[in-house]
A protein has these predicted regions:
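Short, well-ordered alpha-helical microsegments
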Residues: 2, 30-31, 101, 126, ...
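Short, acidic/small-residue loops that bind anionic groups at enzyme active sites
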Residues: 9-34, 41-48, 171-176
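Internal helical hairpin/lid segments
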Residues: 108-160
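ATP/nucleoside-binding phosphotransfer catalytic cores, i.e., glycine-rich phosphate-binding loops
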Residues: 152-193
Length: 193
């Protein structure tokens, strides 16, 4: 688990020697911690092994990211399902639901106030996703977000994830689903920060 590394990281050293930090899933803990403690933008992106058989979209999205996002419309050509429309401005943060849920209540939990949050997961049962999202709601982590992007929850229909949220809270922010976020072959690269 990447969470075990957090107490031993020298964030001042990382800040003085900026590098591209990229990955997804369990690395969500590191990506968000590095951004929040250094201000360096990290990348929720494919892992090196994902490039063994990459799609053109995945390569294009990753290259756009490492070149500073010259193409500003990150979701161009990506299917997006809109559940609650609107305009959101904020800092993009997020990643793997279970990993980030485990950080809530620790010094490493992400500050979601004013953020556009994205969440994804894989191989979790619906009741587990329900429990984790309920934890976010009860911890107040969704109270002041500006927007929410639901990624791929492989094995669970995105409408079910939306239903979990909408039954427990008033959704007064833009909420969309993007199937290219998470444990999928056509993976979009998103900036954390």
């Amino acid at each position: 688990s990447c969470m075990k590394l957090l107490p031993d990281l020298d964030f001042n050293l990382i800040q003085r020697n900026p590098k591209i930090f990229a990955g997804f899933s369990d690395l969500s803990a590191l990506l968000n911690a590095i951004y929040e403690r250094t201000g360096l933008v990290t990348l929720h992106s494919p892992m090196i092994t994902n490039f063994s058989e990459p799609s053109k979209f995945m390569v294009r999205s990753f290259l756009n990211a490492i070149n500073g996002f010259p193409q500003k419309d990150l979701f161009a050509g990506v299917p997006v399902n809109v559940y609650c429309s609107g305009i959101a401005r904020g800092t993009l943060k997020g990643g793997n639901l279970v990993t980030l849920t485990a950080l809530i209540g620790t010094q490493w939990e992400i500050d979601t106030d004013g953020s556009i949050l994205f969440l994804e997961d894989v191989n979790e049962k619906l009741y587990e996703v329900d429990r984790n999202l309920t934890h976010w709601i009860l911890a107040g982590k969704l109270r002041k977000i500006k927007g929410l992007i639901l990624g791929n929850f492989r094995g669970i229909k995105n409408k079910e994830v939306y239903r979990i949220l909408s039954q427990q809270m008033e959704i007064d922010f833009p909420l969309v689903h993007c199937p290219y976020i998470g444990h999928v072959q056509n993976k979009i690269t998103l900036p954390v920060g």
